[in-house]
């Protein structure tokens, strides 16, 4: 999201004010993190994918941060990076539209996506019953959604920002944020579940936790 070679003067951690630091987002739990390069003069470009769970990872995790901790540039980059993550994991997000279930008698998980009301919900449910959606374009055409990628981006950003949401479809709410919430949130973790299932069944779906700058 943002890479500051000379450090971040506004950072709450003193050691980040004079050393290189990057603000990144995970592509499974959508956790916002600050990381430091392990090697000098590491070249990190916008939207680079950095492997975290490998021995030779070029960065080390320093801390979990909140949306409010992001720099102005990181906030500006966030929608573009999220859109890339969604498109890179398109089959997994299509599965969300195919398998999302009711949360209560009156609320369906799909209704948490901005722009999905009762009428659109019924259309999506009817269409996926006839035939599972095969792509986000298919969701748009048969499900009646306009720009589903942007709608997913908006939902993920809302989950990153909010202290009031009860249900988290994609973002894992970190411990510090949960402490600030009046009510304990419910993490549904659709993307995590689909990735795990794809690994267990050997399906050809994108997987593995990584970070995006």
Task: Please provide the spans of the model-predicted regions.
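Conserved hydrophobic/aromatic packing and binding residues within compact polymer-binding modules
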Residues: 121-124
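C-terminal extensions
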Residues: 88-112, 126-213
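Small-residue hinge/turn detector
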Residues: 117-118
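Structure-specific DNA junction-binding interface
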Residues: 1-88, 180-213
